[in-house]
Amino acid sequence: MLRRNLLLSPLALCLPSVLAQAKGKRAVVVYFSWYDNTFQERIRPSDIDETTSASLKAPGQVALVAHWIGKDLGLPIYPIVVKDRYTTIYEDCLDRVIEEKTERVFPELTGPTALPEFDLLFLGFPNWSYTIPRALWSFLSKVQTANKTIAPFCVHGTGGLARTIRDLKSAAPEARLTRTLSIDRSELAESRKRALDWAQNIYFG
C-alpha cells in the first residue's frame, strides 16, 4: 500500500514522514519541560520574571523545540509529566530540584503512559541544576533503551550542557547517543533551522 501511494502521489516524496516510513525508521519525540510540569492555570504574570522568562510561557522552551522536530518529521510527541507538579516560583523550584538530585529521587510519573515501538528517541530536556531532570531517570528506568539510539536536545542558560550528557549516559548505559543539540535559551528564537537540520541529519542518516 505504501509503495502504491508513493507511485500515485509524487509529492508525497517530499514529506519527511513518508520518507521515514519508506526507510522503516521508527522514532518518537519525548521531552521534559518545566512548563508542562507546573499547574499552568496557576501561573500569574508576577511569576514570570527575568529568571523564569520563557520557561513558564506556553508552550515552554524545550516543548517548542520538541514540536518543531515532531511536526517537521511527522513523529508522535510525548511530554514527561510528574505526578507531584513543580512550583512556578523559581527559587522554590530550584530548591526541590537540588534536593531531588542530592537524594537521587525517582519522581513518580503520570506520562507518557505508553510509547510505540521505536529505534530512535529524540529526548529533550533543560539543564536543571547542572544535570538532567530526575524525571528523566524515572522515564528511562521504565523504557527499553538497550541497542536504541537517543538523540538528546537541551535548552539551557549560561551553564551550557554541564553534566547533562554524562548523566544521561549513566541513566541509559546501553543506548547509543548521537551528537547533542545544544541551544542557549537566549538564541532559541533563531534556532529552528539549526534544530531541524540536526534532527533531519540523524533521522535520515
Which sequence ranges carry the predicted segments?
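N-terminal export signals
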Residues: 3-22
